[in-house]
Swiss-Prot record:
ATP binds at residues 18-26, 42. The gene is pknB. Residues 579-627 have a biased composition (Low complexity). GO terms for molecular function: ATP binding; protein serine kinase activity; protein serine/threonine kinase activity. Its EC number is 2.7.11.1. Keywords: ATP-binding, Kinase, Nucleotide-binding, Repeat, Serine/threonine-protein kinase, Transferase. The lineage of its organism: Bacteria, Bacillati, Bacillota, Bacilli, Lactobacillales. It catalyses: L-seryl-[protein] + ATP = O-phospho-L-seryl-[protein] + ADP + H(+); L-threonyl-[protein] + ATP = O-phospho-L-threonyl-[protein] + ADP + H(+). It comes from Lactococcus lactis subsp. lactis (strain IL1403) (Streptococcus lactis). Residues 12-275 form the Protein kinase domain. This is Probable serine/threonine-protein kinase PknB.
Amino acid sequence: MIQIGKIFADRYRIIKEIGRGGMANVYQGEDTFLGDRLVAIKVLRSNFENDDIAIARFQREAFAMAELSHPNIVGISDVGEFESQQYIVMEFVDGMTLKQYINQNAPLANDEAIEIITEILSAMDMAHSHGIIHRDLKPQNVLVSSSGTVKVTDFGIAKALSETSLTQTNTMFGSVHYLSPEQARGSNATVQSDIYAIGIILFELLTGQIPFDGDSAVAIALKHFQESIPSIINLNPEVPQALENVVIKATAKDIKNRYTDVEEMMTDVATSTSLDRRGEEKLVFNKDHDETKIMPANLINPYDTKPLIDKKEDNDSQTDEKAASSEVGNKNKKSKKGLIIGLIILLLVVGGATLAWVVSTPTNVKIPNVTNSTLSQAKSKIKDAKLKVGTVHKQQSSTIAEGKVIKTDPTSGTTVRSNSSVDIYVSTGNEDIIKMKDFVGEKIDEAMATLLKDYGIDESQVTQTSVPSDSYPAGTIIKQSPKKGSSFDTKGSEKITFEVSSGKQVEVPDYKPNGQYMTYSQYQAALKAAGFTNITLDPQATTNQQADGYVYSVYPNVGTSVDPTQEIVVTYSVYTAPSSSSTTSESTTTSETSSSTTSSTSSSTTSQPSTDNNNSSKESSTTSSSS
């Protein structure tokens, strides 16, 4: 059993439990062999100790991850068995899952969503190049570090159990919300299966919701290969058509319509917001296969009495004799049939025209109030009111949130004819409200210049806190608030807060440890040993010979934590013999001093050097008198 605070596998100190899965628990620990470096330790639960399938799957994850070394894949450093418990030791990622990040920040800005999905694609490009298919890509299996780096993890079913899609309990391998249609049907997973899951993740990043949901896993799986993916633009009008097309192609029902590999998808997503793709039309695939198709109304001729399937040419090879013998009878039959067909057509035309007149007669309707609704909600309300959705306009608003409807034209409450067009105005938000960029890792001076240039934010709106850091160079931003992608009102009272690295901090050592003064050479060596590299020696004259060479001051003061590259000024005493005139004066003063005082002064001389340069003459005269 794993115990908090104990040493596991003779190496790892367990700090706390940080996660629980279906088969394993994850702990934060310290690697005592590597200077207490933080690690994540994944341990197979004790109830699976004798489960060969579970152990094989657990070991498969270790082997899969061990093959991959990539900045966007969680690294693995150790694997083994300890006291009958299988374990994997991985790098510790200080952050959250992508699912948690989506819940807090979605819908994400287009650029941020592209950045995240590109890092996932880059990771999977590496995995696929090694023949490894993840099979369970989902936001819960992607980590976002505190610095914003995305890392794919949990290769537990990679390349595993390809011959099986449903277990005895009707649960599918892979999370059903991100499961490709071929996996849902029980087929083997391919590179395109991972691409499908990445497309679903991109949908969720851009909209904040999953495209398919239901009451059961089977119901959701059916939707994956029966229903078209919902329109992203209806849910988030800020998404350009080219970017939505990336999702449409990645999540195509037919594997042949998807990207051939993740590199192709990366190339496409990289240009999806470029100006030359701004007029791109929506991507549509042919749905002829395995579906019933209704012919468009404009292709149907109600007066065409030709058979839908022509007779075979063999029928035309009948002899003239046979044709002649039946000609008269056929004419009579045809004339009767023609009369009947003509009457039917006439009735259909008259009845249809009457019905069309009744149906098409306009009625008066009121335009519904859709202010503050989402675009999709507004469209539904307008259609329900027997009206058509006209042009969707984008407009800034200081009162209506981004993505919500500001107004309609004609305005709500206006009475119009049914089937009239209604334009919708959607808020792009307040121009004073911006989406925060990611400044972590940037120099504070560069970040301040960007804020001023791009948003007009000056120093009065920014609070800086200096924080020591061994990881970030001095002057580099470690943490920011609001976080990347969050909203910030440039005209509001809230301030942007930056934690800025002051670099590695070293404490100035004491020059008189245990009450014993150090010479300047001893103290200089102590400073270098502490890591200081910029040491300035400042000698000061003294007539106190006992103080010669000893340090009596340092700047910055002892105990101050500073950057080891900062200048350290060491002040020490240098003995200078007094001048002859000074000696005469001192001798006169000495002769006036009583012998008892002289004796007392002489006997009180200590072994410690005096470092008070201002009293050097008095000390010197005392020494002269005693001699």
